[in-house]
Amino acid sequence: MGSFSPLMTYRYHLYSGTGNSFILGEFIPPLQHIVFLCQKEKVDGFLCVEPSEIADAKLTIFNSDGSEASMCGNGLRCVMAHVAQSLGLEDVSIETVRGVYQGKFFSMDRVLVDMTLLDWKKTKKTLTHVLPGMPEEVFFIDTGVPHVVVFVPDVNKVPVQEWGAFLRYHEDFRPNGVNVDFVQTKKEDTLLVYTYERGCERETLSCGTGMLASALVAADVFSLEQDFSLLVCSRSGNIVKIFSENGKVFLEGPVTLLNCSENIGEFAP
């Protein structure tokens, strides 16, 4: 890995996974530069893609605050699309700190990844204390990163920033905290999910692991078939499909390359 000086130029791409926006680069700059770049481009995270000895590529994920994340569903789909197009692949494997993930690139409108974990650590919890109007009953689940799922009658009436920050730092989930998903059932097969993301410390337009968490919990709560299929809509208005098939769970949705050319600039001092 090369060293970086404060005035060194950089090259990267901008991607969006259903509204979840990222810088994708083939380098890892110093953490303060990651924060600067994310603020400059107003994105949710930084995706570093490097060669891998056990997969088609290796992915390291950083939140916009510079902290490293163990998983990002939408970011993973963006990387799957990038690697597939760069290498001319349809089936793609990506190495992460949580293991090697397998996916399939059909088109930019349809990028699928197998998100299956051996243990989702699903737990129903009654919170020790809540804010006025907030449900006491929530569901904890690990979809690569920890999430708390909260079912509400109308997500548009939820103060996502206030409630999200409260639950993200709630004493019941210390010391690491959680991402928070507010979920409304729209139809039998459709969920509306708004997510407060740890590491961004705000609501994002979409969160892949959050939509996955919401779908998995909903499948249990509403006693869906083992092989289920749900459509999940995020704040951005974009929809992903989450489905279970033969014991595996898949996340499928569109990816957008926001900037077709590489960007060139200078790192902040």
UniProtKB/Swiss-Prot annotation:
Its EC number is 5.1.1.7. The keyword Cytoplasm applies. It is found in: Cytoplasm. Its main location: cytoplasm. Pathway: Amino-acid biosynthesis; L-lysine biosynthesis via DAP pathway; DL-2,6-diaminopimelate from LL-2,6-diaminopimelate: step 1/1. It holds the Pfam family DAP_epimerase. GO terms for biological process: lysine biosynthetic process via diaminopimelate. Gene3D superfamilies: Diaminopimelate Epimerase, Chain A, domain 1. Substrate binds at residues 20, 63, 73-74, 179, 197-198, 208-209. The record marks 147, 197 as: Could be important to modulate the pK values of the two catalytic cysteine residues. Keywords: Amino-acid biosynthesis, Cytoplasm, Isomerase, Lysine biosynthesis. Catalyzes the stereoinversion of LL-2,6-diaminopimelate (L,L-DAP) to meso-diaminopimelate (meso-DAP), a precursor of L-lysine and an essential component of the bacterial peptidoglycan. Homodimer. Belongs to the diaminopimelate epimerase family. This is Diaminopimelate epimerase. It comes from Chlamydia muridarum (strain MoPn / Nigg). The gene is dapF.
